[in-house]
Amino acid sequence: MSYAETTNPNAPVSMVSTWDKTFAESDKVDHRKVSFQNRYGITLVGDLYLPKNRGDRKLAAIAVSGPFGAVKEQSSGLYAQTLAENGFVTLAFDPSYTGESGGQPRNVAAPDINTEDFSAAVDFLGLQKEVDRNRIGILGICGWGGMALNAASMDTRVKAVATSVMYDMSRAMGHGVGDGKDRYSTSDRRAVLQYLNAQRWKDAENGTFAHGGHDIYVDENGKVTAAERILPETLPDNPNPVLKEFFDYYRMPRGFHARSVNSTGAWTATTPLSFMNMPLLSYAGEITIPTLIVTGEKAHSRYFAEDAFKAVGSKQKELVIVPGANHVDLYDNAAGKIPFGQFEQFFKTNLK
């Protein structure tokens, strides 16, 4: 759908009332479907989770989002519901342009707007009668880990920040995801920019936005290619182990959701442009609040977490490396490796 085809491009796409998550509904929490606006006027849709035994006291709250290209019915909802079982008011939300949230065209990401989405979630939580607005934290999973740290460096209302198997999406798109290090050379970056800006001409001429994979490859001859989808419809023979990790979650019943970009399609093809020139962690050194960065021992993304940990300025920071865990092990608890107890203790200690 193009921007011109809707009378209210910022309105929610839907607000499904039935339980349609990839995880079981807990009998220990109350659940509400909610909506709220960010400062760009885009209406975000979220799931609010509240402990059933909360009484009348005001509670600490946590906004949760991610992974990049996922929806609140997947990993972020599981984290939010589990933390709510342990006494927090939590909000898992769909970022702008994705899931049930508003914004046209669909399947767009941008570092500024997505950082703002976290602050808008703080706005919403701070207005709820069950919440003590002086005790709000945020948690970002995968690519939303970088967004969470960016928000924490700017939004002084956030009192604690945590990440799980984080990606720095500016670095990932701007320098390529390699084997524990950046993949692009300077000439590779220039070739990717040429490729993306050629796509802008095509989009302008066609009056529509093409979609394609955001992980763009440059071969030894300088040829640039990108997949049509984030994940293939079927897994190839002898797949890359990281591709198989993602496929086994997003494309299989374990984690598939029809509204998830990662499960069913791709971002707009030009989505990497703003990430390439707007580093998310430029001000990580100004983060002064308690910070917890969790990653997996075998996660291909581990280097993002370790480098972000070094960059964070807080004196109260902790890096947790989960033994034996790969990246997607911390999306759901299929392998029993998500350290929910450490997330719970971190927020209980620092949101009191």
Protein language model regions, located:
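N-terminal cap/lid segment of alpha/beta-hydrolase-fold proteins
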Residues: 11-57
